[in-house]
């Protein structure tokens, strides 16, 4: 998803300014008073940093309060007021969406007011996702309801070009010159995120 958003183009073929935030929810070690919701990153255009944070997330079970995390992100983040900008939330989970004190209807009302689309991703069977109220389109406007199998392995079909692409990417990274400590840090992060993608499978790494 980060890779796709990073390659987005406007109608006039210019590259838009992409900023993405990341929240974690449903982790029992997070604050109960905050609905087990924790902001990992506010809006940032550093997609390598975002990828690094995504790779570092792990799950340990807990109560998934969907309405709470949607509402929290809508209230805490500085969403642009312009109707011309694409504003969207992607939320993924595998428990009933009605859990918690903050109903998704309240969260969706806030989303509509701010012009934010809410796309839901249920990790499991499609019918079970509907039974657990993840098809929020009628409440949250024009958002989508998607189902994925989190246990399914990604088909990693090797091609004769994989090694060449990886080699050229390493050579390209070697042409960068860091400016100051911040630049050196960003170069190091870029290299680390490359390695994380390589560790998943070749198809993911090539798309990066």
Label each residue range with its predicted role.
Residues 1-153, 159-162, 208:
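Divalent cation-coordinating acidic motifs and surrounding scaffolds
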Residues 139-141, 145-208:
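C-terminal "exit" segments of structured domains
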